[in-house]
Amino acid sequence: MEEVDRLVTASITSIVSALGGCDLASEDASYVLGEEALACLKDVKQWLRAFDEKLGRSDVAKCIASTTLVVSDIPSILSTWNTQSEAGQASKKMDRVALACLEILVPLLWPIEINDETPDNVVASADLLRQAQIRYKRALLGHPSKSILKAVVRLCIPSVAKSKADRDQRDIGIMKLVVFFIRNMLAIDPMEANGKTDDINRSAILEAFENQGVLDLMLTLGSCTGYDIVGVDLPLLDSLYQMVKGLDVVEIFETSPNEPDNQLKNLLDTERRNKPVGSSRHSRFASTMTVLHNGSKISVTGPTASIEKSLEKFDKSKQPGRRLTKPTTGVWEVPVFVGHSAKRYIRVFSELFNDSAFNPLMQTVRKALEQEDDIGPAFKHYLVVLKWFLGVEMHRKTPDFGLIASVVNQEAFIIIMRSIRQGVQAKNWTMVKTAMDSFKTTLVVVNLMSDEEVASNIKARLFYEEEYLTMLADLTRRWALPLTFLQSAVDMTHTLIKTLESFTKANTTLYVRRRRLRAQKKADDTGNVEDLESLPGEEHESAIESRERKFNFSSFESRYFHEDTFTTYRMVLSSFQQLDNCYLGWCLKFLDRAFNKRKCRVMLFRLDYLQLFRTMVKELNSSNPWRKPFEHFFKKYMRQMIPMMKERPCLMVEVIFAKIPGTLHYLESGEEKPVRELKERTSKFVYEFTEGDDIPEERKVCILVASLLDEEKKQLVEWFIDELDSLLRARTGDTQVLNPPKATDELNVPKSIDEDDKFRLLMELVGFTLSRIPKSSVGCKTLCSLPGEVSRADIERATGWLKQWYSTPVDFEPFNKIKRVRRDDKERRGAGGDKEGSQDAEEDDELPLFLASDSEDDIENINDEMFAPVPKEKQQKTKQKLKRKGTSKSTREREKQRDYTAKTTIDIPMSYKSADFIGASDDDSDDERDRKFFEKENELREELRKAEPTINLEEKVDKAFKRQYAYVSDGEEEPLSETESHKQYREKVDEDRDDLSHMAERENRQYDFGDEGHDSDNLEIIDDDSKSPVAAEGTTSSQPIRKRRIVDDSDDDE
C-alpha cells in the first residue's frame, strides 16, 4: 500500500483538531465546537473533492480513517444539533454545520466497488477503507444518544415540507444527500467485519431505522415521487434494494418461534453430509485393506474392511469432484437472516409501501430506465424490488393487485425481457437470474388475479412476442452455470409452461408476433409487388398474418426437449439432498411430461440419468413426500427402456453418448423419419423474348447478356464465363456431371442465382439444371448441375457466344427485346394455341342472345344489328395495383380511398346476358316438352293477331328490342303507331334518364373536393369499364344493381 503524503496527513490532522472536542471540565463532558468549526468542515469537504475525487486517489479518506472525525466528532455534533432542534434552540449556523457533517459522511460511507477502471491505489487500500466504513457504521448506529439517524432525517424535513413550486435545487440536493446516506448505511456489508456483527447487521439497522424515523421518511419520499418530488427516485430504489436483498418473503411472512432451531438443524445436516468419512481411533484394529492405483495408496481399516463393503467405503470417503466452470459476471446474492423484531418491521413497512408508494415510485423509475441504452445496476435494483413487493402482496391476507399494477403491464415486461436479452449477450448471469425470478413472480401474480378478463388480457400481452418465449426456452440450456442459476431457470420454466398450457386451453386463438426474416414482400423489377395467388389483396395478407402469428403450444413445448435442457435438470437433481422439496417436484413433473406425455423417451435413456434415478430412490429420505413419485417414475422408466433396448440394440450404445437429432425418430419408433418432399419454389414471373421463342439460341444469349450488362451485372457474367472455361478444362468426356461452386461464395452476393431470373434463364439456355437445395439456410439455395447429355461442343459454342456478346456492343436496347410476364399467363397462351384460335374461343363464348320467332332455327340474320351480342361486363378487380416503388398502401390510405369511392358512387341497373342464368341442366333436351312449348307459343301469337290484326307482331318486337338496348340511331325515324303500353314504357325510360342526370349533378356538387384546377362542370358519369356501351335504359328495379363512380376528367391524365 502506498504511503500517504505527509503534507496531506498533517493538513487533515490539524483540521480535525481545530474542529472541536469534549469539555472535560464539565460534568457531562459535552462536545464543544471550535470557533472555526464550519470552516474546518468545509476544508475537509474541499480536500475530499479536490484530492480524492478529481485525482482518483484515496489518501484523504485514509487520513480521516486514522482520526476521530467520523467515529467521535461528527456523531457528537449531529446529536447536539438534534437536541437543540427538538428544543427549538438550534441556530442557522448549527444547521449549516449539521449539513456540512452530512456532506462529509456521504462520500466517506460510499460503497467501494472494484472493477477494471478502478485506480490501483484504491484497489490496494480497499480493505483498509472497508474496515474503516464498518467502524463508521458501528459508531453511528451505536452512539449513546441513539439519535444520529434522526438528526439526518430532520435535515431534510424542511425541504420535503415545501411545495414543488417553492422547492429549489438546494432542497433537492439535501433530499438526495439524505437518501444516499441511507443507501450507504445499508450497503456496508457486515460480513467483512472482524469479530461480532450483531450491532451492524441487517436486523440492527432495520431496528434503528424503525426507531429513528427513517422508514417513515422513505414512505413519504416514495409516495410523492414523480408528481411532487423529483430526483430521488433512483437513489430511493437503490436504498430499497439494499434493504430487501437476500431476504426471503416466505420467511418474513411465515415466522414461528422454533424456526431458528430448524435453521441450525439444517445447517448441521448439510455439514454432516459434506464431511468425508474418515477413520477414527477406535477403528484401527481388525483387518486392513490397501489398494494401490496410479502410484497412490488408499487404505481401509476396521471391522468393515470386508471385500463386499470396501469399495463402497472407498467411495464414501471421497470428496465430490469439483467441476471447473468459467467465472461468471456479478456476485450471487447470499441469503440473509434477520430476527423476529426486524421481520415485523420489514413486513409492516413493505405493506405500507405497497399501499401508498409502490406504484408512483416504480412508474417513475421505469420511465427513467427506458431512457438508458445499456443495462446497469439500476436494472437489477428495479427487478429485485419488483420481485420483493410482488411477493409481499401475494402473501398478504387480503391482496389487492391494483396496488402493484404499475409493474404488471407490457412496459414492465419489456424491461424484464430487455434485461434478460442484454444480460445473455454480456454474459451477466446475475442480471439474467434476477430477471428470471422477477418474471416468474409476475406470472404467479397474474395467475392469482380474481378478475379473469384482466388476467387474460395481461397474459396475452406478456406472451405476444414469440422472440421472448424462444429466449426464455433457451435459458434452460445453460447447464454449465452455478446451481443457483439453474434453480431459477427450473422454477421459471415450471411456472411458464403451466401458465401457457392453461391459457392456451382457455383461449384457442392466442397469437404471438413472430419476427419475419423479411419485413415485407420484395418487389419485382417492374416495381409491382407480387400478387398473392389464392386470396385477393388484403384478405390474403390477413390470412398469412394469422397463420404465422397463431401460437402453437406443442411447438413451443418441444423447444424444451433438448439435450442441454435435460442436462440442466440432471445437474439440479444431482444435488437432491440440498434441494427444497418444491424443486424435486418441478423437475419430476417436467421429466414426466417429456417421458410420458410427449414420448421423448430416448432423450432420457442416458447412463447419467439411470445412475441418478437409482441413487435418488436409494438415498432419498423416506419422509420426503417425493420419494414414492420418484420410485413410481423409475419403475415406469425401466419398464419402457428394457423392451426398447431388446427391440433396438443400438440403444445400448446410445445411452453412453449424446443423442443426434437426426437419429431420434428412428431410436424412438424404429422407423426412418419420413422425408417431407420439398415443393419446388418457382417464381410467379418469367421472362420471354418479344421477338418470339422461335428465334435462334445465339440471339437469345445475345439479348440476355446485353440485358445483364445493362443492369450492371458484369461480374456475374464474368463468373459464368470463367466457370465454363474451367468446366471445359476439367471435362474429359461427355458423360461427367459437374456441380459448379456457388456464385455467392465468389461474388459475395448471397442470393444472386436465387433471385436473378434473367441469369437463371441464361444458365438454362446453356444447359444447366437448376434445383432447390433442401434445408439450406446460409448462402445460395440453388444447386446448379450440368447433365452429361450436354456435349463438349455445346459448351464450347455457348462459351463462344458469351465471350462474343460480352465484348461486342449491340445495336438495340435490351429492355425492348425481353419482357417480364406472369408465368400462368404464358402457360395459358401456350395451352390455348395461336391467337386466332383463342379469339375464336372467346367469340364462341359470347354467342348472341336470340328471341323466339316463327322459325326458331332460322339464323340467317345472325349478323343483323338487332342480334348484336350484349357486351361482356369486365370483372371488378379485387387486387389493387401498387405503385412502381413496390410499397403497399398503408391502412389509412386504403380507408381514405374506400371513403372516396363510396361517396362518388351511385347505383344504376345493370344488364346481364342470358348465359349468366343458364345452368348445366338447361342443356338437357326433351322433345315432348319442346313440342308443348311451341304449341303454346303459336296459340299466344294467334290470340294477339286476333286482338290487333293491323299490327305486325314481329316488327313491334323488333322495335322494342332496339329501343331497349339503345340501338336506335338519331337519324332513324320511328313509326308513330304504337300501343298505349309502349308509350307509357318509353315515358318511364325518359323519366329514369332525367332522374339519373339530376342525381349525378347533386353528387358532383356534394362531393366537390375543392381542387382549384378542376371545375365541377367537368364531372361526368362514366362506367368502371370504359369499353362497355351504355347500360340498358329500360331495366327494371328487380334487376341486379351495379355501381358507377363519378370520376373527374383529370383522373385520365394521371
From Swiss-Prot:
One of its GO terms (molecular function) is DNA binding. Residues 522-543, 823-846, 865-953, 968-1054 are annotated as: Disordered. It is found in: Nucleus. The keyword DNA damage applies. Residues 823-838, 890-901, 928-953, 979-1017 have a biased composition (Basic and acidic residues). Residues 877-887 have a biased composition (Basic residues). Signal peptide: none annotated. The keyword tRNA processing does not apply. GO terms for biological process: DNA repair; DNA replication checkpoint signaling; meiotic cell cycle; replication fork arrest. GO terms for cellular component: replication fork protection complex. Pfam families: TIMELESS. Keywords: Cell cycle, DNA damage, DNA repair, DNA replication inhibitor, Meiosis, Nucleus. Its main location: nucleus. Disulfide bonds: none annotated. Transmembrane segments: none annotated. PANTHER family: PROTEIN TIMELESS HOMOLOG, TIMEOUT/TIMELESS-2. Belongs to the timeless family. Component of the fork protection complex (FPC) consisting of TOF1 and CSM3. Forms a fork protection complex (FPC) with CSM3 and which is required for chromosome segregation during meiosis and DNA damage repair. FPC coordinates leading and lagging strand synthesis and moves with the replication fork. FPC stabilizes replication forks in a configuration that is recognized by replication checkpoint sensors. This is Topoisomerase 1-associated factor 1.
